[in-house]
């Protein structure tokens, strides 16, 4: 399949304009593209424009907005097939319910151009029922997409590899994003799994009385969080080897990590746990 170049796109479609879809729309508008939009919720058109208007000053301050970008270049449609007609790139962000998504995809597909790519913000690929499953690509953002650079890209055995390549070029070169390739389907993909692993241990430390909610948050913000904003855990530990490489780091420090891993907790999110964390968060809020 020959797809148009990302640079040639002057209009895209956003299907589902809740928080995630509206954020995508704000980004696409800022990068000089017009947006066809669809959402069946009453008042969705006004809500979308209001979201974009709130986001625009921040995008301008961050230098995201390109010359000629128009924050009002939104056409709202009542029919998803009309919204995607003659559009080369479609970003779908409707609620994560299989029945809703499958019904929507079936309604959209008659209007989709032969070369159109359908990117979904969903947590899994949903190709069942599509006449052209090869053009569905998972493009999972870290919220909100108009501010956080990360997009996780995933295709499976039904996906055209060229469609995934195209999405990488589109998000990076046209939208200024940072993409990673997820090589196999796992629950929550990559970034959310890393986030979940850290939060699990943070909860465990609270429940064990090791530190307060506020101090655990401080430990992340003023410690490893500063490092992680620059580079990831593998490269940090690789550099900690003194230039000798990751294998030397593991040989030297691996036994210590193994002991720490054995002591990591697996807390349950019970009502009691929720109450303890909520109380800790209220205390942290009051201290700010």
Regions found by a protein language model. Give the residues of each.
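Rossmann-like NAD(P)-binding element
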Residues: 40-43, 47, 58-117
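Helix N-cap / loop-to-helix initiation motif
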Residues: 41, 160, 211-215
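Rossmann-fold dinucleotide-binding core
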Residues: 117-183, 188-193
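Structural motif
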Residues: 15, 38, 77, 93, ...
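NAD(P)+-binding Rossmann beta1-loop-alpha1 motif at the extreme N-terminus of oxidoreductases
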Residues: 1-62, 111
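C-terminal regulatory/interaction module of P-loop NTP-utilizing enzymes
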Residues: 172, 199, 203-212
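NAD(P)-dependent Rossmann-like dehydrogenase/reductase catalytic/cofactor-binding core
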Residues: 2-8, 31, 176-181, 207-208, ...
């Amino acid at each position: 399949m020959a797809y148009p170049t990302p640079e040639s796109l002057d209009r895209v479609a956003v299907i589902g304009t809740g928080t995630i879809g509206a954020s995508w729309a704000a980004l696409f508008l800022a990068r000089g593209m017009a947006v066809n939009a669809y959402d069946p919720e009453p008042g969705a058109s006004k809500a979308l424009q209001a979201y974009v208007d709130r986001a625009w000053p921040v995008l301008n301050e961050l230098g995201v907005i390109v010359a000629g970008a128009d924050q009002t270049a939104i056409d709202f449609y009542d029919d998803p097939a009309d919204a995607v007609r003659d559009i080369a790139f479609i970003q779908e962000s409707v609620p994560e319910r299989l029945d809703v998504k499958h019904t929507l995809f079936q309604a959209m597909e008659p209007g989709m151009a032969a070369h159109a790519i359908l990117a979904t913000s969903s947590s899994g690929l949903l190709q069942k029922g599509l006449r052209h499953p090869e053009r569905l690509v998972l493009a999972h953002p870290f919220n909100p997409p108009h501010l956080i650079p990360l997009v996780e890209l995933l295709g499976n055995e039904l996906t055209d590899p060229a469609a995934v390549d195209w999405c990488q070029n589109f998000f990076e070169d046209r939208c200024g994003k940072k993409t990673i390739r997820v090589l196999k389907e796992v629950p929550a993909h990559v970034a959310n799994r890393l986030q979940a692993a850290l939060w699990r241990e943070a909860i465990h430390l609270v429940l064990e009385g090791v530190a307060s909610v506020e101090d655990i948050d401080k430990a992340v913000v003023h410690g490893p969080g500063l490092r992680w904003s620059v580079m990831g855990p593998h490269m940090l530990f690789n550099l900690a080897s003194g230039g000798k490489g990751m294998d030397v780091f593991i040989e030297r420090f691996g036994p210590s990590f193994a002991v720490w891993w054995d002591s990591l907790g697996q807390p349950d999110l019970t009502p009691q746990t929720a109450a303890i964390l909520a109380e800790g968060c209220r205390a942290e809020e009051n201290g700010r």
